[in-house]
């Protein structure tokens, strides 16, 4: 899980989700998991 100021989808499978006002990216590739700071 990377915590970043700006999250961007890395590949086609990355999905942007908003949970409790926090932008998250989930993906099959666990290295692509991100959360906005």
From Swiss-Prot:
NCBIfam families: rpmJ_bact. This is Large ribosomal subunit protein bL36. One of its GO terms (cellular component) is cytoplasm. It comes from Borreliella afzelii (strain PKo). SUPFAM superfamilies: Ribosomal protein L36 (SSF57840). It comes from the Bacteria. Belongs to the bacterial ribosomal protein bL36 family. Pfam families: Ribosomal_L36. The keyword Ribonucleoprotein applies. The lineage of its organism: Bacteria, Pseudomonadati, Spirochaetota, Spirochaetia, Spirochaetales. GO terms for biological process: translation. GO terms for molecular function: structural constituent of ribosome. Keywords: Ribonucleoprotein, Ribosomal protein.
